[in-house]
């Protein structure tokens, strides 16, 4: 057996199969195991090594026959995060630094201390000891272990995030650590590629959600395909970071197992994912390998949803995906499914998918979208609510759901080139996503309510730790959302200090962006190098700068400022600037040293919700630039924030403020002060109104000083104040 492993290891490590067909490795390894005695008795070691190298050459030729797709199908191409170096001291640079130095190491540590690695080790032990059934070691009865069937994905997601870090901040120790984890993961894989520790640890007594056999509970809670999805995403990222196919081969073997066993053909199990993400991941695997089977499987998983025996709104299986026009059910599942639909539609041209996505996105941003960019109103089912059901104190707004919305909105932009999707993405990024992690990267929210009575606090980890590990993989990928290219047009979507190397028409353009956004609205774009000569620069004018908080009537500003920006090139006004779908288009022959200067006014503005949002009637939210603000008790100790009345025409004052939080966290923000009134009652029950001042901080910054009261929507009348807390 040792001999066989040595030979197969030579093949796997040869790197002739970075994208090759893993079935060749599997077949060859089985052949060696069965014939190793004959081989050892019939050939010298030199002959064996020559035979091995010949096999490598043959398999290498097979691998080269795979054609990687030239495009992901979207008409607009994302500039990869590896081509955009975000400055370390910028708003987003600090968050990437926190993810690199705190969040990802913390997640790896938690995977150790919470026994996530042990799950793989126990599964490997079971595979290595076929007679073991778990009964001799009761702690290995999975039904009694304190684990969830998707705990494996926390390992995968953290590896994915670490792999993104490796691509921008090479770290040999981190690379070696990941390699050691992959040894554990590989050992837990069953001979046919199946990798799901909740069953493999003890097939006789798997986790209660796993079902007696493979796939039978997939449409409920087994998460077998969910595990596949995160594994594939992580494996693709690891391959792109290291060039090693070690993880990629593991993931492909599981994906190939799924393709063999899950589908509409006779002898297969016809199920669709109970928790979506495999659709996006399999599409990504197709783009990396060129193996169309993965794209076909992704489309099957979407096309058959609503056509199997399971019909639940919770998992969006209540009807076929092309018939869905509203966002319903578990918000994370939904967001991942919609993003997967976009990926498949881009590659297949399925207009029915696109029509459904247009309707769903419109439903979200016009009726089910929080001012913070979060989604998922209900704790029950972590789900979207009905139209205009947007409670504040009980809002769920899972961090993972916000990340899913970023995936969806960005894909819709790549498909349609409309800035309204980036406007929504920006709102979600600056409020709904980063509120899910503390500024130092060490504590996390699962739900993100818009009101708190002091019972909500970030935690260092969760039993169900999907949100921290999701942050691990998302934050390092942020630079990939800043720019995009279509033909000879460069889209500037987000504003953060960075240097980008962009390919336009096959020629390199180096662009430097300087800004202190989101604290002020001055953005300078300097051409450092330009081999492309003439091209169009499409600069997004944020919706908040043109009186449009969201692309619907769900929210509106109480004032009316229709133009809050100015733009110059080399200090001079630009003549003949065109606007298209929310972008200013400047088309010219660019020279090294050219500077585009965009100034966005950043007044403090109040927002009101559509009257059909009953929880927000008579109340206003406060915004400045892309940031939503909130009142927190820690800044307002002289009165209850729940009894504050915002005046009809408030006068705001923007001030610098340092938040000295718990756990040695200290950071600066732009705070907002406003004079108003506080309402109370005397001993006889009579209402008393007195003048006071309220301080507001960015929503993402709350809860760094312990659990405390917090409010986003502030009343403007005693009637709206409602019951005192």
Residue ranges and their predicted role:
Residues 170, 186-190, 243, 259-263, ...:
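Helix-capping and short linker residues that terminate individual alpha-solenoid repeat units
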Residues 298, 357, 423-431, 436-526, ...:
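C-terminal beta-rich recognition modules with glycine/proline-rich loops and embedded aromatic residues
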Residues 1-65:
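Bacterial Sec-dependent N-terminal signal peptides
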Residues 201-222, 248, 253-269:
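Asp-box/WD-like beta-propeller blade repeats and closely related beta-sheet repeat scaffolds
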Residues 312, 369-387:
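Flexible glycine/proline-rich, aromatic-decorated loop/lid segments
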Residues 174-186:
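Aromatic-lined substrate-binding rim segments of carbohydrate-active enzymes
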Residues 64-172, 176, 206-241, 276-293, ...:
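Aromatic (Trp/Tyr) and acidic
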């Amino acid at each position: 057996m040792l001999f066989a492993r040595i030979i197969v290891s030579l093949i796997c490590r040869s790197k002739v199969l970075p994208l090759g067909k893993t079935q060749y490795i599997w077949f060859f390894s089985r052949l060696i195991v069965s014939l190793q005695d004959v081989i050892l008795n019939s050939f010298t070691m030199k002959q064996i090594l020559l035979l091995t190298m010949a096999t490598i050459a043959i398999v290498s030729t097979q691998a080269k026959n795979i054609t990687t797709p030239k495009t992901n199908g979207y008409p607009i191409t994302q500039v990869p995060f590896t081509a955009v170096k975000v400055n370390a001291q910028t708003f987003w640079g600090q968050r990437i630094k926190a993810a690199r130095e705190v969040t990802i190491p913390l997640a790896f540590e938690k995977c150790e201390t919470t026994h996530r690695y042990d799950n793989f080790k126990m599964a490997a032990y079971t595979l290595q000891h076929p007679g073991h059934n778990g009964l001799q070691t009761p702690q290995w009865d999975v039904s009694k272990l304190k684990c969830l069937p998707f705990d494996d994905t926390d390992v995968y997601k953290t590896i994915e995030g670490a792999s993104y870090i490796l691509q921008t901040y090479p770290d040999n120790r981190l690379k070696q650590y990941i390699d050691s984890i992959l040894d554990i993961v590989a050992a837990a894989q069953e001979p046919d590629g199946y990798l799901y520790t909740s069953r493999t640890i003890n097939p006789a007594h798997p986790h209660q959600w796993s079902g007696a056999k493979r796939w039978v509970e997939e449409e409920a809670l087994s998460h077998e395909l969910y595990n596949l999805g995160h594994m594939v995403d992580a494996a693709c990222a690891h391959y792109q970071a290291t060039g090693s196919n070690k993880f990629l081969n593991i993931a492909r073997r599981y994906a190939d197992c799924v393709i063999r066993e899950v589908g509409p053909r006779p002898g297969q199990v016809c199920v669709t994912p109970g928790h979506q993400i495999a659709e996006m991941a399999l599409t990504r695997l197709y783009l990396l390998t060129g193996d169309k089977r993965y794209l076909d499987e992704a489309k099957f998983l979407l096309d058959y949803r609503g056509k199997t025996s399971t019909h639940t709104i919770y998992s969006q299986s209540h009807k076929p995906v092309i018939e869905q026009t509203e966002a319903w059910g578990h918000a994370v599942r939904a967001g991942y499914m919609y993003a997967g639909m976009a990926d498949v539609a881009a590659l297949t041209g399925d207009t029915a998918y696109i029509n459904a996505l247009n309707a769903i996105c419109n439903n979200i941003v016009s009726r089910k979208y929080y001012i913070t960019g979060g989604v998922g109103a209900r704790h029950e089912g972590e789900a979207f609510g009905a139209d205009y059901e947007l409670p504040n104190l009980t809002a769920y707004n899972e961090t993972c759901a916000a990340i899913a919305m970023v995936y969806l909105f960005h894909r819709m932009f790549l498909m349609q080139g409309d800035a309204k999707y980036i406007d929504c993405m920006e709102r979600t990024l600056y409020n709904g996503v980063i509120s899910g992690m503390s500024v130092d990267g060490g504590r996390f929210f699962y739900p993100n309510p818009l009101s708190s009575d002091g019972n909500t606090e970030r935690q260092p980890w969760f039993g169900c730790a999907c949100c921290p590990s999701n942050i691990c993989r998302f934050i390092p990928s942020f630079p990939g959302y800043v720019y995009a290219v279509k033909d000879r047009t460069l889209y500037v979507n987000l504003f953060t200090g960075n240097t980008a190397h962009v390919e336009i028409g096959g020629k390199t353009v180096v662009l430097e962006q300087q800004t202190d956004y989101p604290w002020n609205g001055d953005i300078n774009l300097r051409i450092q190098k330009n081999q492309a000569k003439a091209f169009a620069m499409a600069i997004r004018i944020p919706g908040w700068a043109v009186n449009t908080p969201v692309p619907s009537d769900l929210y509106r500003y109480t004032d009316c400022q229709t133009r809050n920006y100015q733009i110059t090139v080399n200090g001079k006004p630009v003549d003949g600037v065109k606007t298209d779908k929310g972008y200013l288009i400047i088309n010219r022959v660019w020279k090294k040293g050219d500077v585009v200067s965009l100034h966005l006014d950043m007044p403090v503005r109040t927002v009101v919700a559509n009257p059909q949002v009953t929880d927000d009637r008579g109340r206003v939210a406060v915004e400045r630039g892309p940031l939503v603000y909130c009142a927190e008790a820690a800044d307002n100790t002289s009165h209850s924030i729940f009894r504050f009345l915002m005046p009809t025409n408030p006068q705001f004052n923007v001030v610098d403020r340092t938040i000295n939080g718990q756990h040695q966290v200290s950071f600066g923000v732009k705070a907002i002060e406003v004079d108003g009134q506080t309402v109370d009652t005397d001993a006889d029950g009579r209402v008393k109104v007195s003048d006071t001042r309220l301080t507001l901080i960015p929503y993402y910054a709350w809860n760094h000083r312990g659990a405390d009261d917090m409010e986003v929507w502030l009343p403007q009348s005693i009637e709206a104040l409602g019951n005192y807390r």
